[in-house]
């Protein structure tokens, strides 16, 4: 009952509860933390931390890798899958992506092959199909880990193409929530489609940081679109 009351008081999280898997994981975070963060980006981080480390630690299970170290390998895997527009990937391809990251956290080559099944068995964050293909338990986790990877590594991103592509929109929202979203919003304004401007409007609410001049330019654009002949633009504004 306490959890339901907390969710009702956090509109940014209540929409997530329609998915049974996400609701279960939200309940797990609430159980181990005693409270819920107020932002989606913080909730996803907490879920990953609980699943990849704290849950096992609470049960007294020894783990050779910390949650942070596991993410070092999982984040580039998620990013590569997003860039390939994949929801599942073969074990050989996955290990090729994660080989160097796993070495960087001192996982020996002969031990690396057990990483995927270990993550599945210990956290459920990854799932293996009957055909031996691997996928993240929910697209949300693939998107979140991709956004975290981009945010942490600061690599040049293809905003100009992605802002008008719905496949990338949730990744970009989550990226904005933990980064300076100025370049992203500028790309949305330059594209000037309803889809791109809708993404930019979301960034107004979720961005960790956004330059004042770009924020004002977007607000002025949305105000101007109130008089647009396009009903979709008027609705967005």
Stretches with model-predicted labels:
Residues 1-25, 46, 114-115:
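Amphipathic alpha-helical segments of the small helical/lid subdomains adjacent to P-loop NTPase cores
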Residues 6-11, 60-64, 112, 129, ...:
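Active-site-adjacent structural elements in folded domains
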Residues 17-22, 26, 47, 140, ...:
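Solvent-exposed aromatic/hydrophobic patches embedded in short alpha-helical segments
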Residues 20, 144-237:
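Hydrophobic repeat-domain scaffold segments
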Residues 27, 78, 99, 172-176, ...:
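Amphipathic alpha-helical segments within well-ordered protein domains
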């Amino acid at each position: 009952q306490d959890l339901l009351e907390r969710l009702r008081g956090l509109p940014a999280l209540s929409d997530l509860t329609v998915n049974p898997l996400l609701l279960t994981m939200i309940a797990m975070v609430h159980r181990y933390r005693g409270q819920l963060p107020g932002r989606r980006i913080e909730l996803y981080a907490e879920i990953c931390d609980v699943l990849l480390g704290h849950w096992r630690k609470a049960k007294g299970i020894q783990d050779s890798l910390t949650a942070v170290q596991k993410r070092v390998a999982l984040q580039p895997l998620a990013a590569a899958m997003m860039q390939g527009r994949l929801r599942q990937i073969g074990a050989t391809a996955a290990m090729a992506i994660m080989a160097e990251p796993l070495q960087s956290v001192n996982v020996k080559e002969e031990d690396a092959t057990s990483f995927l099944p270990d993550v599945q068995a210990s956290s459920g964050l990854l799932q293996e199909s009957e055909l031996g293909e691997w996928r993240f338990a929910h697209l949300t986790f693939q998107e979140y880990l991709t956004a975290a990877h981009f945010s942490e590594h600061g690599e040049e991103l293809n905003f100009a193409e992605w802002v008008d592509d719905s496949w990338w929109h949730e990744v970009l929202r989550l990226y904005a929530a933990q980064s300076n979203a100025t370049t992203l919003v500028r790309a949305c304004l330059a594209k000037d489609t309803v889809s791109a401007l809708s993404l930019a409007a979301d960034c107004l609410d979720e961005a960790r940081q956004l330059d004042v001049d770009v924020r004002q330019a977007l607000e002025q654009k949305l105000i101007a679109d109130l008089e647009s002949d396009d009903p979709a633009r008027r609705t967005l504004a």
